[in-house]
């Protein structure tokens, strides 16, 4: 019976932060730590007051996304208060 009580208590025990490293938020590829390792830089702070440590070498591998070049849109000569959308109904088919 005592062993059963110990098992029940251990099931409801909450693990501390040391069990698994938390990832940073805002799509930053890093981990929340008190001190960054050698070769890591801190980008932003985490919610728990720790640093968001990002591996500097791995961060350089990622190429920033480039937006495709858009051609200028021709403007209408008449100012319209609404947008005309193409619609298809049963009667037009």
Swiss-Prot record:
Keyword Disulfide bond: yes
Disulfide cross-links: 24-52, 32-46, 36-53
Pfam short name (any one): Defensin_beta_2
Example GO biological process: innate immune response
Chief localization: secreted
A cellular component term, taken from the record's GO annotations: extracellular region
Signal sequence residues: 1-18
Keywords attached to this entry: Antibiotic, Antimicrobial, Defensin, Disulfide bond, Secreted, Signal
Keyword Transcription tagged: no
Subcellular localization, as worded in the UniProt entry: Secreted
Domain of life from the UniProt record: Eukaryota
Family classification: Belongs to the beta-defensin family.
Summary of the function given for this chain in its UniProt record: Has antibacterial activity.
Protein name: Beta-defensin 128
The organism of origin for this protein: Macaca fascicularis
Gene name of this polypeptide: DEFB128
């Amino acid at each position: 019976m005592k062993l059963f009580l110990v098992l029940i208590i251990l099931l409801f025990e909450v693990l501390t932060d040391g069990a698994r490293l938390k990832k940073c938020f805002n799509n930053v590829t890093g981990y929340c730590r008190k001190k960054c390792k050698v070769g890591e830089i801190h980008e932003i702070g985490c919610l728990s007051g720790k640093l968001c440590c990002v591996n500097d070498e791995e961060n350089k591998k990622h190429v920033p996304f480039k937006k495709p070049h858009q051609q200028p849109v021709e403007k209408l000569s008449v100012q319209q208060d609404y947008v005309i959308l193409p619609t298809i109904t049963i009667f037009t088919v």
